[in-house]
Design a protein with these regions (language model features):
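A short, flexible loop at the N-terminus of ABC-type nucleotide-binding domains that lies
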Residues: 1-4, 9-26, 32, 74-75, ...
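The feature captures the beta-strand-to-loop junction immediately N-terminal to the Walker
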Residues: 39-41
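Helix-to-loop junction immediately C-terminal to a conserved catalytic motif
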Residues: 54
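Conserved ABC transporter NBD signature motif
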Residues: 62-72, 78
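Conserved ABC ATPase "signature" region
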Residues: 112-130
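Conserved ABC ATPase signature
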Residues: 134-138, 142
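Hydrophobic anchor residue at the start of the ABC signature
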Residues: 148
Length: 153
């Protein structure tokens, strides 16, 4: 379950004379343990909301919790519970090949186990043949699948 309690998110002015932008005000929201979709127009705040869920952005006031874990107090734990894929997966794929990206995502495992587990995950998802290809040689859909595998790892 994800809960937002009295959440405000205010972006301070960028330039002198600008006003602060209020993005969220007094938001109270509870999402139960189901898969959800966040939809809306470009620039409507979907990514900002998701970043609040996994601690990539902190609210100006209020609390965000995931399965009872406060995002501000336990960011590492929350990031293990909440993941999302960017529209452009290149924004989150940091390494040169899928196997390297997935190995990086498995940092919670002992170092000796990571590469083998990464290959296993790719194989289980029908992506094993892409393991050592350049990220830039993959199609957009293949990049999305690799990004999803990294998030689920």
């Amino acid at each position: 379950m994800i809960e937002l309690t009295d959440v405000d998110l205010v972006i301070p002015p960028i330039r002198k004379g600008d006003e602060a932008r209020v993005l969220l005000k007094e938001i109270n929201l509870t999402l139960t343990e189901r898969r959800i979709a966040v939809i809306g127009a470009n620039g409507s705040g979907k990514s900002t909301l998701l970043r609040l869920f996994n601690g990539m952005r902190q609210p100006t006031s209020g609390t965000v919790s995931v399965k009872g874990h406060d995002v501000a107090e336990e960011p590492r734990k929350v990031r293990q519970l909440v993941g999302f894929i960017f529209t452009d997966p290149l924004a989150q794929l940091l390494m040169s090949t899928p196997i390297e990206d997935l190995t990086l995502s498995l940092g919670h495992l002992p170092r000796k186990e990571r590469a083998g587990r990464a290959q296993q995950i790719l194989d289980e998802r029908g992506l094993g043949h892409l393991a050592h290809q350049s990220i830039y040689d993959l199609s957009g859909g293949e990049r999305q699948l690799v990004a999803l595998a990294c998030v689920l790892a």
